[in-house]
């Protein structure tokens, strides 16, 4: 089976204010996706950008893990990822270029990629999973799309995808999937992939206590006028 390296592009170090505040949390959305792949029988690894120095660390992980597929799965539970989209995009594109240089296929899932798939596909991503990606990822793995690319017709039968059938072709967007209602159907997050001790040390050093994230639902009950939600829906 293909080894899959999961990752995301929120580098805490790139945000000076938040880096100084030093309140890092593991990438919940990313490790849930990794758990979905693990439940499908895949070997998984994690590149956690939150605590990494730069995109160069991702290339080091590529060499060390030797994956057959990279999945950049942004942590949509982290509100900070909505406030730093341009910097996140820059980092993600560098990471995709690194995967392409090493001959590793890549898929992307995230808020920015859902709205603007073109730059990610241009940078080397084979697919963008738009909207919630859990079921789309499971569907792709069920069809063994991680082992070898499917043809455009087969991809066209899978909801929740953006792809370019050819190098100069227009982007094809398949129908959006319904929002997942039964969150209990998802596997428990793959916490073992995270360096929890590193998070604990940082919290204790800077705050004298340790805080860890959990999620009990999806969506947001608030209506902040500065948020992307009123703009993009």
Report the location of each language-model feature:
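Radical SAM [4Fe-4S] cluster-binding motif and immediate context
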Residues: 25, 184, 189-233
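Residue-level recognition of beta-strand->loop/alpha-helix junctions
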Residues: 8, 46-50, 231
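Glycine-rich beta-alpha loop elements in corrinoid/cobalamin-binding modules
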Residues: 29, 33-40, 45-180
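Conserved glycine-rich "GG(E/T)P / GGGxP" loop and the immediately following alpha-helix
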Residues: 11, 22, 74-86, 230-233
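Short glycine-rich His-centered loop
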Residues: 2-23
């Amino acid at each position: 089976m293909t080894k899959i390296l999961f990752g995301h592009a929120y580098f805490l170090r790139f945000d000076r204010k938040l880096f100084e505040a030093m309140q890092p949390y593991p990438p919940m959305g990313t490790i849930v996706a990794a758990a979905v792949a693990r439940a499908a029988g895949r070997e998984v690894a994690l590149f956690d950008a939150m605590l990494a120095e730069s995109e160069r660390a991702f290339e080091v992980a590529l060499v060390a893990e030797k994956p057959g597929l990279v999945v950049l799965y942004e942590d949509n539970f982290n509100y900070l990822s909505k406030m730093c989209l341009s910097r996140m995009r820059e980092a993600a594109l560098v990471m995709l270029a690194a995967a392409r240089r090493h001959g590793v296929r890549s898929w992307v899932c995230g808020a920015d990629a859902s709205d603007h798939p073109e730059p990610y596909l241009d940078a080397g991503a084979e697919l963008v999973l738009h909207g919630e990606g859990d079921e789309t990822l499971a569907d792709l793995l069920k069809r063994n799309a991680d082992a070898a690319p499917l043809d455009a017709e087969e991809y066209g039968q899978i909801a929740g995808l953006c792809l370019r059938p050819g190098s100069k072709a227009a982007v094809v967007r398949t129908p959006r999937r319904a929002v997942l209602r039964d969150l209990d159907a998802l596997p428990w997050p793959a916490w073992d992939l995270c360096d929890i001790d590193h998070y604990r040390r940082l919290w204790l050093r800077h705050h004298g206590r340790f805080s860890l994230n959990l999620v009990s639902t999806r969506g947001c009950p608030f209506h902040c006028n500065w948020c992307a939600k009123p703009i993009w829906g």
